[in-house]
């Protein structure tokens, strides 16, 4: 567990995986560059997780790869290590491109690549919206081996010819379910059109609904699959509960009651819209509760500063939209409250996966009005899980 990956159930994971995939039990067995191995060990990894031991070698062989694994299993390091193995740092041109659905995730991936590539003199730039375009242009003109970005800004930089694509050999789509939802689909096609025809494509996500798998056929050739069966995807160690609140207006009082009874280390409260986030934040502050909030419409600098405060533990309770739910590592989070149930059932696992990340125990509490009962049952069926009514002693479960 020192390396931050929960391996307790690796032996029980069922892999619906291509026949040709072999397991590499150690990083040495993957025949990685010496400088990369040094970075991997310095980062704190000792041995590969289940998904790493299956996917890295296939990606390094140049195979198009679909890797599905739950939060906290080392997905980001899977493609980061693969990228660092295949790039040539002597050529200062962009050779790998990673697309993510949120700016925070793109920035986090950049920091993982820089850390793992610490002994390789690698250049990696986070190319994201909401930041200074001039800085992007300067960094890209200087030459970056890897670019981690959001689809809109990356497509823009390619169109302006600052992000040169002729040397790109790998495209990674992280959190592919969210990326390929309607919002980003066109922008991904835009980017893909500019890439060399032989570009390798790697798709990584905790959830891969069938329509997404279907779509990947458009830009993947005979992909290798490393898939964890879906009903394994509700994270063990997370206790899931619901509170019946009958009416929407009662949710606020319920939340205030919870504040008094729970001694929380850190908590995230999810709402479905940015307007609701702002409204709830104001209401909580009026009631003298200290909370911070974040959503996609905030300026990037403000979002960065809120994330940093939360990471460092300076702020204890964060109210957010789903922009926060995707892949952000904050290890102290022990409680997630779905003030609103997610409108997209795939987002449920991304939200609650936050609370038990890296094998930490966590509690997820869903506020359920009479209108929400059907959605809750749908989530239970989809993930083959059981969500019980919250017991009185919920504070004990967090301690």
From Swiss-Prot:
It is found in: Nucleus, Nucleolus. Its EC number is 3.6.4.13. It catalyses: ATP + H2O = ADP + phosphate + H(+). SUPFAM superfamilies: P-loop containing nucleoside triphosphate hydrolases (SSF52540). A motif (Q motif) lies at residues 25-53. Residues 237-398 form the Helicase C-terminal domain. The keyword Cell cycle does not apply. Keywords: ATP-binding, Helicase, Hydrolase, Nucleotide-binding, Nucleus, Ribosome biogenesis, RNA-binding, rRNA processing. One of its GO terms (biological process) is rRNA processing. Residues 56-226 form the Helicase ATP-binding domain. A motif (DEAD box) lies at residues 174-177. Pfam families: DEAD, Helicase_C. PROSITE patterns: DEAD_ATP_HELICASE, HELICASE_ATP_BIND_1, HELICASE_CTER, Q_MOTIF. InterPro entries: DEAD/DEAH_box_helicase_dom (IPR011545), Helicase_ATP-bd (IPR014001), Helicase_C-like (IPR001650), P-loop_NTPase (IPR027417), RNA-helicase_DEAD-box_CS (IPR000629), RNA_helicase_DEAD_Q_motif (IPR014014). ATP binds at residues 69-76. One of its GO terms (cellular component) is nucleolar chromatin. Its main location: nucleus. The keyword RNA-binding applies. One of its GO terms (molecular function) is RNA binding. It is an enzyme of class 3 (hydrolase). Belongs to the DEAD box helicase family. DDX48/FAL1 subfamily. ATP-dependent RNA helicase involved in 40S ribosomal subunit biogenesis. Required for the processing and cleavage of 35S pre-rRNA at sites A0, A1, and A2, leading to mature 18S rRNA. The Q motif is unique to and characteristic of the DEAD box family of RNA helicases and controls ATP binding and hydrolysis. This is ATP-dependent RNA helicase fal1. It comes from Aspergillus clavatus (strain ATCC 1007 / CBS 513.65 / DSM 816 / NCTC 3887 / NRRL 1 / QM 1276 / 107).
């Amino acid at each position: 567990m020192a390396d931050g990956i929960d391996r307790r159930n690796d032996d029980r994971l069922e892999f619906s995986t291509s026949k040709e995939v072999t397991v590499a039990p150690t990083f040495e067995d993957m025949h990685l560059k010496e400088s990369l191995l040094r970075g991997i060990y310095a980062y704190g990894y000792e041995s590969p997780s289940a998904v790493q031991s299956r996917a890295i070698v296939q990606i390094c062989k140049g195979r198009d790869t679909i890797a599905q694994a739950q939060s906290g299993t080392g997905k980001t390091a899977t493609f980061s290590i693969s990228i660092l193995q295949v790039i040539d740092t002597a050529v200062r041109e962009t050779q790998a491109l990673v697309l993510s659905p949120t700016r925070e995730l793109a920035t986090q991936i950049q920091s993982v690549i820089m850390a793992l590539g610490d002994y390789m003199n690698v250049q990696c730039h986070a190319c994201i919206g909401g930041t200074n375009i001039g800085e992007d242009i300067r960094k890209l003109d200087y030459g970056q081996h890897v670019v981690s970005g959001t689809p809109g800004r990356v497509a823009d930089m390619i169109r302006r010819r600052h992000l040169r694509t002729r040397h790109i050999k790998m495209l990674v789509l992280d959190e592919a379910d969210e990326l390929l939802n309607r919002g980003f689909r066109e922008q991904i096609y835009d980017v893909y059109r500019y890439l060399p025809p032989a570009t390798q494509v790697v798709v990584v996500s905790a959830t891969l609904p069938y329509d997404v798998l279907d779509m990947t056929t458009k830009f993947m050739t005979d992909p290798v699959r490393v898939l964890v069966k879906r009903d394994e995807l509700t994270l063990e160690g997370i206790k899931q509960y619901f509170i019946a609140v009958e009416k929407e207006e009662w949710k606020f009082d319920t939340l205030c009651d919870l504040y008094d009874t729970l001694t929380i280390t850190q908590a995230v409260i999810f709402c479905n819209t940015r307007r609701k986030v702002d409204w709830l934040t104001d209401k909580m502050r009026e009631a003298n509760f200290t909370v911070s909030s974040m959503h996609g419409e905030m300026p990037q600098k403000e979002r960065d500063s809120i994330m940093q405060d939360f990471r460092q533990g300076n702020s204890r309770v964060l109210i957010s939209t789903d922009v926060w739910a995707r892949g952000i590592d904050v290890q102290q989070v022990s409680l997630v409250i779905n003030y609103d149930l997610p409108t997209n059932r795939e987002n449920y696992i991304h939200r609650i996966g936050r609370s038990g990340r890296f094998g930490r125990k966590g509690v997820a509490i869903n506020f359920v009005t009479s209108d929400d009962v059907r959605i809750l049952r749908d989530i239970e069926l989809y993930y083959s899980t059981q969500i019980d009514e919250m017991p009185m002693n919920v504070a004990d479960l967090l301690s």
